[in-house]
Amino acid sequence: MKARLPLLVGVTGGIGSGKSTVCAMLAEMGCELFEADRIAKELQVEDPEVIRGIEKLFGPDVYSRDASGKLLIDRKAIAAIVFSEPEKLAALNRLIHPKVREAFVNEVKRCAREGKRILCKEAAILFEAGADRDLDRIIVVAANDGLRLARAVARGLACEEARKRMQAQWPQEKLVERAHYVIFNDGTLDELRSQVEQVYQSLLTVVE
């Protein structure tokens, strides 16, 4: 008998919206989780083709090695460039997104083999990369701009850098328009969990 594919759910939202927190809650409730942004970061220091492409785009100085010989990448330097030069960001995305998609396809196959019912794909850039076409449902995590900015700064970003990242992403209203579910993360963790639980129960009705 052919393995049944899991329900494929995208989780996205602007910087500081809280999508990682939502995904952690969904994972606790029983969903499988594919972290596209984490995979992309791993590719930047592990995949030879990606490394060569990044060196070509940004120069070899964005890479260094620590005392043990481990390859390191200067993400701050790259971020400062790509959020000021949209064409560089587009080129970086063209380099990385096909490989992230390949990794996602492999994860879908694993979930199908193991009988997992719901696979959530967390990605900061979902619609922009056309990744929504591979998915059955989309969850957008939203919060007001002031709160999102404060959260980004609390994570260590300079205020101006956080603003640039917000401006480089799709407007939140545009994301909300294309979502199957919208989770508003403007309140307490308990209020957030209650919304996530409602969405999870709705997803279960699709797979049962």
UniProtKB/Swiss-Prot annotation:
Entry EC number(s): 2.7.1.24
GO cellular component, as recorded: cytoplasm
One Pfam family cited in the UniProt record for this chain: CoaE
Gene Ontology biological process terms from the UniProt entry: coenzyme A biosynthetic process
Catalytic activity entry: 3'-dephospho-CoA + ATP = ADP + CoA + H(+)
GO MF annotation, one: ATP binding
Enzyme superclass (EC): transferase
Residue stretches making up the DPCK domain: 8-208
Highest taxon in the source lineage: Bacteria
Keyword Lipoprotein (UniProt): no
Residues that hold ATP according to the record: 16-21
InterPro entries: Depp_CoAkinase, P-loop_NTPase
Places the protein is found: Cytoplasm
Keywords: ATP-binding, Coenzyme A biosynthesis, Cytoplasm, Kinase, Nucleotide-binding, Transferase
Family statement: Belongs to the CoaE family.
PANTHER family: BIFUNCTIONAL COENZYME A SYNTHASE-RELATED, DEPHOSPHO-COA KINASE-RELATED
Known role: Catalyzes the phosphorylation of the 3'-hydroxyl group of dephosphocoenzyme A to form coenzyme A.
Designated name of the protein: Dephospho-CoA kinase
Lineage: Bacteria, Pseudomonadati, Chlorobiota, Chlorobiia, Chlorobiales
